[in-house]
């Protein structure tokens, strides 16, 4: 048995220049694992707490409290634990915090330790992380959900919907699917420049131009897909992030106020006109009646993903399954606080035929943990931004490495 011999954490920077937690775990044989915790901008109200210092440093965004919690409170409790018993470690972290949302220690403290320990254990066994976490059945390369036009909370523009994405289904390998996205992305930049639009990038590497409405980005994507020669092989996915513009029982966008029913009909019209295969957070996180209606209307036609709705929480997802809200769940480890809790949510979804989408956050780093995690859990889909900015391409490049060992791309079988 190898045990945890040393734990330490310190501040590093994420892709927005804000501090975040980096944790390092050393085992009794000298194996080391490290992990950097991401941070979201558009967040669900029921997410696990990201502990910030709220003082004068970094505009209040420092994480020295979370770092101290790792170096003192957590380290004292987990030194000597079996490094290969991830469940025991994560349950210990949860019990040590004593709340249901990590409001004492901070999910940015617990997740960093959880991820770093998994990495150290994999290193000790000489295994890639995806194989250690997923076992012999970890083999499926996910279909990327690439966010190439940014809006909402991820961009400084006038577009309400947060993400306009493309999904390359019609390919037999991950590398060929990724190539199609690259080619479409390059064409999109030229289209925007030629039409006098900004080619500035949003938080997730997608372009962030001002556009007439929430339909114009879809038209742009359709034009670029056609010019690249990938019609019928690449589809469109949307992250509406509608909680961000929901107020007083209405959805305020494009200068108008929409009811839930109005917005659902808008989605029905969009799906009839465009090859849309997935809509994420189409309604607000607490608009439960609306979610039930949306699922009744479109749930047998397209993927309806709950992000703010479920926040990677097993108990909340279970309620959603019972009420028949959505048919897929976004998986963000930092929403729930440990690797084990994340895996439990994925397994619950898969047992109930809900699809899973592994996801980054808008505040990211060069850490590619979620690439391995997506393969480990056979989620079949991954969201990790556009093919720009190193914190995004790190995940794609890691998946290209994994493909050298495991070449089953889900593609049209999704």
From Swiss-Prot:
Organism encoding this protein: Campylobacter jejuni (strain RM1221)
Similarity annotation: Belongs to the enolase family.
Catalytic residues of the enzyme: 204, 332
Upper lineage: Bacteria, Pseudomonadati, Campylobacterota, Epsilonproteobacteria, Campylobacterales
Matching InterPro entries: Enolase, Enolase-like_C_sf, Enolase-like_N, Enolase_C, Enolase_CS, Enolase_N
Gene Ontology cellular component terms for the protein in this record: cell surface; extracellular region; phosphopyruvate hydratase complex
Binding site for Mg(2+): 239, 280, 307
GO terms, biological process: glycolytic process
GO molecular function: magnesium ion binding; phosphopyruvate hydratase activity
Reactions catalysed according to its record: (2R)-2-phosphoglycerate = phosphoenolpyruvate + H2O
Domain of life according to the entry: Bacteria
Residues the entry annotates as binding (2R)-2-phosphoglycerate: 162, 332, 361-362, 383
Predominant place of localization: cytoplasm
Cofactor(s) essential for the protein: Mg(2+)
UniProt keyword annotation of Ribosomal protein present: no
Pathway given in the UniProt record: Carbohydrate degradation; glycolysis; pyruvate from D-glyceraldehyde 3-phosphate: step 4/5
Cofactor binding note of this UniProt entry: Binds a second Mg(2+) ion via substrate during catalysis.
Gene name for this UniProt entry: eno
Gene3D superfamilies: Enolase-like C-terminal domain (3.20.20.120), Enolase-like, N-terminal domain (3.30.390.10)
Compartment(s): Cytoplasm; Secreted; Cell surface
Name used for this protein in its record: Enolase
């Amino acid at each position: 048995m190898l045990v945890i011999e040393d734990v330490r954490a310190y501040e590093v920077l994420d892709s927005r220049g804000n501090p975040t937690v980096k944790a390092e775990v050393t085992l009794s044989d000298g194996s080391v694992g490290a992990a950097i915790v991401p941070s979201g901008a558009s967040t669900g109200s029921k997410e696990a707490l990201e502990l910030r210092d709220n003082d004068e440093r970094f505009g209040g965004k420092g994480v020295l409290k979370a770092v101290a919690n790792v170096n003192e409170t957590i380290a004292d409790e987990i030194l000597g634990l079996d490094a290969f018993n991830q469940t025991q470690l994560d349950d210990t972290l949860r019990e040590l915090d004593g709340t249901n949302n990590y409001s004492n220690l901070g999910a940015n403290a617990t997740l960093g330790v959880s991820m770093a320990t998994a990495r150290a254990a994999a290193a000790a066994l000489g295994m890639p992380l995806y194989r250690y976490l997923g076992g012999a059945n970890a083999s499926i390369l996910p279909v990327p959900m690439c966010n190439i036009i940014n809006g909402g909370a991820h961009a400084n523009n006038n577009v309400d919907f947060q993400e306009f994405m493309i999904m390359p289904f019609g390919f037999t390998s991950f590398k060929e699917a990724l190539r199609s996205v690259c080619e479409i992305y390059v064409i999109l930049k030229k289209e925007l420049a030629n039409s006098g639009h900004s080619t500035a990038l949003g938080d997730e590497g997608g372009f962030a131009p001002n556009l007439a409405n929430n339909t114009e980005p879809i038209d742009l994507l359709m034009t670029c897909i056609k010019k690249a020669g990938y019609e019928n092989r690449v589809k469109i996915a949307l992250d509406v992030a509608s909680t961000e513009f929901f107020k007083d029982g209405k959805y305020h966008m494009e200068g108008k106020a929409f009811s839930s029913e109005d917005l659902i009909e808008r989605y029905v019209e969009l799906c009839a006109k465009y090859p849309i295969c997935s809509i994420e957070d189409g309604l607000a996180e607490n608009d439960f009646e609306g979610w039930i209606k949306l699922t009744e209307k479109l749930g047998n036609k397209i993927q309806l993903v709950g992000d703010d709705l479920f926040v990677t929480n097993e108990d909340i997802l279970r309620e959603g399954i019972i009420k028949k809200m959505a048919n897929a769940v976004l998986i963000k480890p930092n929403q729930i606080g440990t690797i084990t809790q994340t895996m439990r949510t994925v397994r619950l979804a898969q047992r109930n035929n809900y699809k899973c989408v592994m996801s980054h956050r808008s505040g990211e780093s060069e850490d590619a943990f979620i690439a391995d995690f997506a393969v480990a859990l056979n989620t079949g889909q991954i969201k990790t931004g556009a093919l720009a900015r190193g914190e995004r391409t790190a995940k794609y490049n890691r998946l290209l490495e994994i493909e050298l060992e495991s070449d089953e791309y889900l593609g049209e079988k999704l």
